Amino acid sequence: MLNEFPIFDYEDIQLIPNKCVIKSRAEADTSVTLGNHTFKLPVVPANMQTILDENVAEQLAKGGYFYIMHRFDEAGRIPFIKRMHDQGLIASISVGVKDYEYDFVRQLKADAPEYITIDIAHGHADSVISMIQHIKKELPDTFVIAGNVGTPEAVRELENAGADATKVGIGPGKVCITKVKTGFGTGGWQLAALRWCAKAARKPIIADGGIRTHGDIAKSIRFGASMIMIGSLFAGHIESPGKTIEVDGEQFKEYYGSASQYQKGAYKNVEGKRILLPAKGHLQDTLTEMEQDLQSAISYAGGRQVADLKHVDYVIVKNSIWNGDASH
């Protein structure tokens, strides 16, 4: 029962160091395998319209990073798969659960993507289970990620239906207001929810939402994530698709949630909001910094690779990791 677990979030946790066994952090290996492919980092930019487009997806794939293309340009998905495969790159797309998506999946038989993510806000649903089974029947070699969920029961059901990985997180993201609009979600206890779900999982878990710092990547791995989906930290780059807006001489990029009025059109029910982020530099600079910070984390863990982070001790320090840092 959940009540037996301590409830905490990223800012409540500090990992405890072990003796370092490498001469330099550069020796630490940050790569991770998901399905039949190995990627440079255990992170994936959120499959949102303001985070990536086809060009960013291509840049990520060429660089050896995992990506998931969003599902908001439905007609462009088959040409996108062809574009990626023509270059010898992996194709990784998203689908919903509407009736027409069943026909779409059948159309993929001629050129199946390596990864499909079934992407709906409340993934513990009969509609998702049915779509997992359909994809597995039509495209048995495609790696299926299903979500989003927030309970061990959901993880087990989706895995049993055939999902190869589950995505955990209901509304913890910076531009997600599901928790406010509905009263439901993992906002404020996403890391504890990840731990709870990971204990039940037999297959990889992708932690989705609530990441505010690079240290949160290491914490996610400690509590059971194989891959971490990140939105706001990847938003606002020069390559990001969001509009660039100038305010008082400063450049900002817009960033909005996947069920916001900006993405859905003004009159649909919304569970996302729009914010402006100061424009950042190049995406590759952020990826490199993430890699270096994760290498440092692995060295603090006394390890050589990502999996070594799973075994470190931790303490719960209620909301105090910013103590003594006046800038937060």
Curated annotation (Swiss-Prot):
UniProt cross-references to SMART domains, sorted A to Z: IMPDH
Active site as annotated: C176 (thioimidate intermediate)
CDD domains per UniProt: IMPDH
Signal peptide: none
Residues engaged in binding NADP(+): 205-228
Pfam families reported for this sequence: IMPDH (PF00478)
Catalytic activity: IMP + NH4(+) + NADP(+) = GMP + NADPH + 2 H(+)
PROSITE patterns: IMP_DH_GMP_RED
Keyword NADP found: yes
Presence of the UniProt keyword Zinc-finger in the record: no
Transmembrane segments: none
Keywords, ordered alphabetically: NADP, Oxidoreductase
GO molecular function: GMP reductase activity
BP terms from Gene Ontology: purine nucleotide metabolic process
EC number: 1.7.1.7
GO CC terms, sorted: cytosol; GMP reductase complex
Function: Catalyzes the irreversible NADPH-dependent deamination of GMP to IMP. It functions in the conversion of nucleobase, nucleoside and nucleotide derivatives of G to A nucleotides, and in maintaining the intracellular balance of A and G nucleotides.
Protein family per UniProt: Belongs to the IMPDH/GMPR family. GuaC type 2 subfamily.
HAMAP family: GMP_reduct_type2
PANTHER family linked to this entry: GMP REDUCTASE
NCBIfam families: GMP_reduct_2, PRK05458.1
UniProt-recorded name of the protein: GMP reductase
